[in-house]
Amino acid sequence: MILRKYRTEDCESIAGLFYETVHSVNAADYTPEQLNVWATGKVDLEAWDKSFREHFTIVAEETKEEKQDFGKRLLGFGDIDSTGYLDRLYVHKDHQRQGIASAICDELERAVPAEKITTHASITAKPFFLKRGYRVVLEQQVERGGLLLINYVMEKVVK
């Protein structure tokens, strides 16, 4: 696996990984209806690309030795803004629990001068962030498409 900075040509693959990951990995903690409003399959690629370019965004991809087919496969991605808000962190459904999210998160946490990192973690991601030293600040219900989804505002002091 290699970690590298985001490139615009990654955006479409990231959107696909996001959809598949949400609908498989998060299925144990959210209903199918909630998953459908969280990841609709219709991402505004221009808006996401702009956001990824404005943030510090890392992608993980297979190395030549790891790849199973033609082309490199995206394993995961994450992004953080200059204030220390960790916006997105997703790993391919077939590559969970292999240290990929930790490697991406390490890079993101080091990349910004903020003294504190904050994120809005799903029920599924909460244990991952707790193990990394984050604490729950608030449990909240977020409305998406008329449905409520539980997530957690979490923070970690890094400096």
Positions of predicted regions on the chain:
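Conserved acetyl-CoA-binding loop of GNAT-fold acetyltransferases
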Residues: 132-140
